Amino acid sequence: CQVVERGLDAKAKAAMLDAHNKARQKVANG
């Protein structure tokens, strides 16, 4: 996710990153 929104607060960003990382792990695990 290269989207950086000034309107997002840190919590929303952290949640998005967490979801992104989980999805990436899923792909890595097959």
From Swiss-Prot:
Species for this entry: Scolopendra angulata (Barbados giant red centipede)
Post-translational modification: Contains 3 disulfide bonds.
Family designation: Belongs to the CRISP family. Venom allergen 5-like subfamily.
Localization per Swiss-Prot or TrEMBL: Secreted
Protein name stated in the entry: Scolopendra 20528.11 Da toxin
One term of GO molecular function: toxin activity
Record's miscellaneous remark: Shows similarity with the venom allergen 5 from wasps. This similarity may explain why patients with allergies to centipede venom also display allergic reaction to wasp, honey bee and/or yellow jacket venom.
GO annotation, cellular component aspect: extracellular region
Main location: secreted
Tissue distribution of the protein: Expressed by the venom gland.
Domain of life, source organism: Eukaryota
Keywords carried by this UniProt record: Disulfide bond, Neurotoxin, Secreted, Toxin
